[in-house]
Every structure is written in C-alpha cells, then in structure tokens.
C-alpha cells in the first residue's frame, strides 16, 4: 500500500524519495506542491494500493503518453519486478546494462553505498564490493524475470553504446516504444526544469541521478572511464561470468 511505501522509505537517507510521487502529480496535473503532497497523504490514509495509485498517475495521460517508471532499486528485489508483469497490461521493459566496473565507479563517486538496500545488513564489505554485489544481484534478478516476458516487450540497451552513439540507440528505443524520435532526445541536459529532476520544493534533495546537474552534454568518455581506476581482476568470478553473458 501507499502507507507501506511511506514506512519503508522514511529514514535519514531515503525520505527524500517519498517526494517522487508528488513531483509526478505536479507535472501531470499542473498541481502545486501542497496539492500534490496532500493528495499523496490522503491516498496513504485511505490504504490505497500502489497499483491503484499508478492508475491515478496514468489517468491524466489519457492513452496519449506513456507512463515511465525509472526506479533503479526495483531491480534488486525480484518480487517487485514480478509485480510489474502482474499489475500492468503488457508493460514494456528497457534493460539498461553497463560494465560492472563502470557501475561500481559511478556508485562510489556518488557514495551510493549509503542507500544500497543490501548495505543495510551488517557486514564487512567496502563500497566497491557492495556496488559489485548489487550489480550481480540485479542481473540475476533480471535474468529470472526476463524468461517470462515475450521478446517483443523487452529491449536490452548497453550504456556504452548509448553514450557513444546516442542517436542510433535512441532511435532503436523509440521504435521499440512506438514513439517518434526527436532531436531533443540527444540533449537531455537542455530544459532541465522540465526533466522532473528536482523535488517538490527548492530545497528538496534530488531523488534521481545525483550527478545529473554536473553535466551539460552526453560524454562518450564515460563509457570506459572506469579503466583509469580499476582492473577487471578485482571482480569476483560470478560477476565476470555474468558480465560475459552481456557482452563484456
């Protein structure tokens, strides 16, 4: 339920994530922050399910636009991923993959180990190991659910291809989604106020890519930047084997 969601995300490092739903309502309905937050609170108090709340998000779209949910943490819980298939009619999946050490480097730069779900358990893993474990768990979960999704509703995209050949990859994604390609798609850092990368208030913490506002253009060098910091020898055997199945 929405109340369960609030309980799960209430915490020093995660409470800002609660604003995502309100921010979406602001964008979809043209509501103020106060209106959106009040609506979410009412949904929580009514015991509304998350499935029903998604229906509230889809209603303003009127079948003319697509509802996109880009929540990376879903991928570490296979039960959440299975609910996507159960709660939606023929959902489309874009599986964005990246070399494990590219992901590790990004997570370490953002100190994302503070937010990693598996990092809440006591252990002696460092930030690099936690990031690698998260990457491996994510790919294992994806493999588990992908076998039950028809190929026509699943598209795998390599991060490295996306930053090196953005237009070609984006055109393929558009064909998959059944939407028209637009030149503005290769300039994601333009019109940032329309990207829903902010919170409901000026002082809100960002709930998406923590480094988004540090960039002004797609940088192809990001594809292999990790090679300056790591050798593939640091990866565990299972991680290397999984990476090989993804073409790395």
Where are these regions (language model features)?
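General structural signal for secondary-structure boundaries
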Residues: 6, 10, 18, 32, ...
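PAPS-dependent sulfation machinery
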Residues: 1-74, 78, 86-87, 114-122, ...
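Short, mixed-charge, low-aromatic patches
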Residues: 5-12, 35-42, 91-100, 124-131, ...
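PAPS-dependent sulfotransferases, especially Golgi type II membrane carbohydrate sulfotransferases
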Residues: 44, 108-112, 116, 139, ...
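PAPS-dependent sulfotransferase catalytic domain
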Residues: 44-61, 78-79, 90-186
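Generic alpha-helical structural element
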Residues: 73, 131, 162, 227-231
């Amino acid at each position: 339920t929405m109340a369960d969601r609030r309980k799960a995300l209430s915490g020093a490092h995660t409470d800002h994530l609660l604003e995502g739903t309100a921010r979406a309502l602001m964008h979809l309905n043209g509501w103020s922050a106060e209106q959106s937050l009040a609506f979410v609170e009412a949904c929580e108090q009514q015991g509304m399910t998350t499935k029903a709340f998604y229906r509230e998000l889809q209603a303003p779209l009127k079948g003319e636009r697509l509802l996109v949910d880009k929540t990376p943490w879903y991928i570490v819980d296979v039960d959440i991923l299975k609910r996507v298939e159960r709660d939606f009619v023929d959902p489309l999946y874009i599986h964005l993959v990246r070399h494990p050490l590219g992901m590790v480097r990004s997570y370490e730069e953002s100190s994302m180990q503070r937010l990693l779900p598996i990092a809440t358990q006591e252990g002696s893993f460092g930030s690099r190991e936690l990031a690698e474990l998260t990457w491996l768990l994510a790919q294992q979960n994806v493999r588990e659910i992908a076998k039950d999704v028809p190929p026509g509703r699943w598209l795998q995209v390599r991060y490295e291809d996306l930053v090196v050949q953005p237009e070609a990859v984006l055109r393929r994604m558009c064909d998959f989604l059944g939407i028209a390609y637009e030149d503005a798609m290769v300039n994601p850092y333009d019109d940032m106020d329309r990207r829903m990368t902010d919170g409901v208030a000026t002082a809100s913490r960002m709930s998406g890519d923590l480094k988004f506002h540090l960039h002004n253009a797609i940088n192809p060098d990001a594809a292999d930047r990790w090679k300056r910091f790591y050798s593939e020898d640091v990866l565990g055997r299972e991680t290397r084997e999984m990476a090989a199945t993804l073409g790395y």
